[in-house]
């Protein structure tokens, strides 16, 4: 039968069907927030970085998006689980420290959005089909 999951933001929705369990999150790349404060509060808490001064908004959005996809994969709660997820850019891996969950993820940048998929498979997903209702 497969698994169906979805994510939405103010002007887009993503639906994903896959044979295995999968999580997805979408957010706008122009989202307005203080990315440094956000990163200090929610991310990099396990490996405090000396290079927080060059963290870009895009880097934080990608991390946020991947972690949200992992939380959705686990059917977790954002407020409860966000501090337990570790994000690794290379290899593209997400680890829940408390539950010892290891996931892989893929990032897709599409027009004004960044999209992340979280899954157990070892191979990365290729975005084979993206359907839009607008011409870009």
Predicted segments with their positions:
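Conserved nucleotide-ligand handling architecture
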Residues: 1-136
């Amino acid at each position: 039968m497969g698994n169906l999951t979805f994510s939405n933001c103010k002007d887009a929705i993503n639906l994903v069907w896959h044979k295995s369990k999968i999580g997805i999150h979408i957010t706008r790349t122009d989202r307005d927030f203080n990315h440094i404060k956000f990163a200090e509060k929610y991310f990099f808490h396990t490996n405090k970085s000396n290079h927080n001064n060059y963290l870009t908004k895009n880097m934080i959005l990608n991390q946020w998006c991947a972690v949200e996809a992992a939380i959705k994969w686990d059917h977790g709660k954002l407020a409860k689980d966000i501090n337990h997820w570790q994000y690794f850019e290379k290899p593209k891996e997400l680890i829940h420290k408390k539950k010892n969950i290891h996931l892989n993820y893929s990032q897709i940048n599409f027009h004004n959005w960044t999209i992340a998929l979280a899954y157990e498979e070892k191979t990365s997903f290729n975005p084979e089909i993206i359907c839009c209702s607008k011409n870009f």
